[in-house]
């Protein structure tokens, strides 16, 4: 038998903060040949958090939808949102407009980060939701100036994977980080029982339902898996 301390961390952010301090120069994530360290992730997610808190004036408990595949922008946005005490609503990038409408209305999300490839679907239903703020990211936004520009050009103009869309007043992901850099970061107080995620089911027995996952839920699962792997 092995005893584990499920109260070791107050929140999911505490867990990440430990990683940021212990392994600053280690690679945290890698995508399409580009990697970011834990130090990079720490700094970038603070900028994203600052933007949500100071520019959008989002409050603890507000919902942010993230509709993105596995690109480097995703962990930056996810951790940044959690640092602001915001509830993350992960959204399947392959959702139809009808499925998006249901999830966004049901969750009550006020803001969304969406990859430009799917923004045309958001345009169709955004007026029926509570979404006030839209952040649009391009596939190559975190790949560096040269490679990122090339990837974005190929995706949009060669492969034609970004249908035209109109979302007046949206923020670009790069602009979000620039605006967030203006502020000094301050961690929002998050308790173990605060909701971290609204994770929606597959909807195999009806409409998709949002499962409330607290910081304690997620941290406990991480500790359990880590203990089992040891």
Predicted regions, residues:
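Conserved pre-ATP/AMP-binding loop-to-beta segment of ANL
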Residues: 164-200, 207, 230
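Structural core segment of the AMP-binding/adenylate-forming
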Residues: 83-175
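Adenylate-forming
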Residues: 19, 29, 41, 45-48, ...
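Flexible, non-catalytic linker and terminal segments flanking ANL/adenylate-forming cores
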Residues: 1-9
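Conserved AMP-binding A3 loop
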Residues: 37-39, 196-223
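AMP-dependent adenylate-forming
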Residues: 14-37, 186
């Amino acid at each position: 038998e092995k005893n584990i301390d499920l109260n070791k961390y107050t929140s999911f952010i505490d867990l990440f903060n430990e990683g940021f301090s212990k392994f600053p120069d280690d690679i945290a994530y890698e995508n399409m040949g580009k990697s970011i360290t834990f130090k990079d992730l720490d700094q970038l997610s603070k900028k994203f958090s600052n933007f949500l808190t100071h520019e959008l004036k989002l409050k603890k408990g507000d919902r942010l939808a993230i509709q993105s595949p596995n690109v480097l922008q995703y962990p930056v946005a996810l951790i940044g949102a959690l640092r602001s005490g915001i509830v993350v609503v992960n959204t399947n990038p392959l959702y139809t407009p009808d499925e998006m409408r249901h999830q966004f209305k049901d969750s009550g999300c006020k803001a969304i980060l969406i990859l430009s490839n799917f923004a045309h679907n958001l345009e169709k239903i955004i007026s029926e939701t509570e979404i006030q703020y839209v952040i649009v990211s391009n596939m190559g936004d975190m790949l560096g100036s040269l490679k990122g520009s090339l990837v974005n050009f190929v995706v949009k103009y060669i492969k034609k994977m970004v249908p035209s869309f109109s979302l007046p007043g949206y923020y670009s992901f790069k602009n979000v980080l620039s605006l967030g850099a203006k502020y000094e970061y301050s961690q929002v107080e998050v308790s173990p029982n605060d909701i971290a995620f609204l994770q929606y089911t597959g909807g195999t027995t009806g409409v998709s339902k949002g499962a409330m996952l607290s910081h304690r839920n997620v941290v406990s699962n991480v500790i359990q898996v880590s203990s089992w792997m040891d």
